[in-house]
């Protein structure tokens, strides 16, 4: 059995937009809402792990978790090197400045999945209140 690993404060992976714009290529960028972070997200982020990985947490209407909480959860994943909370304008600036070797947008998938998850959650709550 290995020794005890030191705790790492993964919040240090969370950068300001200005700091993220100073990153050196090559870098991969993945953007999304990550509200709620799911296993599929972790698998997708692991798939693009061939270069330093910058994840951009975007705003979403009717959020379940605030942006900082979502950024902290994403930063806790071992495959993620950096996280930035940004709006779409900030995302565009990052893509233009960093010219990522890989760029994956997950927000469309997140929106569909979030709506489905929200519906399932509401149905579950309704069933629990009936019984």
What residue spans do the PLM features occupy?
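Nucleotidyltransferase catalytic core that binds NTPs
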Residues: 1-131
């Amino acid at each position: 059995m290995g020794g005890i690993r030191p705790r790492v404060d993964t919040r240090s992976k969370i950068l300001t937009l200005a700091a993220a714009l100073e990153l050196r290529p090559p870098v991969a960028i993945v953007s999304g809402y990550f509200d709620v972070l799911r296993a599929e997200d972790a698998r997708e982020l692991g798939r693009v792990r061939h270069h330093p990985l910058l994840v951009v947490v975007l705003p979403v209407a009717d959020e379940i978790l605030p942006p900082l909480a979502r950024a902290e959860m994403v930063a806790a994943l071992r495959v993620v090197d950096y996280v930035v909370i940004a709006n779409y304008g900030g995302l565009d600036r990052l893509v233009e400045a960093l010219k990522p070797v890989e760029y994956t947008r997950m927000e469309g998938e997140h929106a569909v999945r979030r709506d489905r998850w929200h519906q399932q959650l509401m149905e579950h709550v309704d069933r629990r209140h009936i019984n």
